[in-house]
Amino acid sequence: TIGRRQRQMCIRDSNYSYPNCPIKFTNIIKSNNVPYWYFISLYKSVGEEYEWTDMLKQKKEITENFLNNKNVYFYSLISSGVPIGFFILDYRKKEICDISYIGLTKGNLGKGLGKYLFKTAFLMGWDTNYINKLTVNTCTLDHKAALPLYQKLGFEPVSYTHLTLPTTYGV
């Protein structure tokens, strides 16, 4: 088993502009009716090193209902036709956008794409008239650059949870 300290972070305002992508032929594409196989494949590719397990443990129908909810938006980061990352914006709670998942596949770390992806998700999350709070969850198992980036953009911790989980990937 592993223990992790999970934080919920929130921010209430933003005055940033959209960043330029650091790599040519790379785009963020919004997907509608995301196939389960596509999401799970990308989720595993991104989350394996960080013990992302919650979506693997729930029933397929629950994940599909989440992904295809009219208030949940799935975005893929595509480079030269290949998915290399993703993020999900969850607007199911009134006046709140939660960046519920965000990450890059292993071979795409250290290229400036994480900052680009998060800043874009951050700005897209605010890009509606009815949002007054943006949240993101992180934990001690996430990439070491995640928390400092969130704090640099103005996020502040609002809650902490301690979880003890069985390892899924053998980390």
Regions of interest found by a model, annotated:
Residues 102-110, 140:
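A short, internal acetyl-CoA/4′-phosphopantetheine-binding micro-motif in the GNAT/acyltransferase core
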Residues 21-55:
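Short amphipathic alpha-helix that is part of the acyltransferase structural core
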Residues 135-146, 163:
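Conserved beta-strand-loop-alpha-helix junction that forms the acyl-donor binding cleft
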Residues 4-8, 12-27, 32:
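Acyl-donor-binding surface of acyltransferase catalytic domains
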Residues 110-125, 148, 152:
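Conserved acetyl-CoA-binding loop-helix of GNAT-fold acetyltransferases
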Residues 1-7, 11, 162-171:
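Single conserved hydrophobic/aromatic residue that forms the stacking wall/gate
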Residues 50-51, 65-76:
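A short helix-loop-beta-strand connector motif used in the catalytic cores of GNAT acetyltransferases and
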Residues 58, 78-79, 84-96, 101-102:
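A conserved beta-strand-loop-helix scaffold within acyl/acetyltransferase catalytic domains
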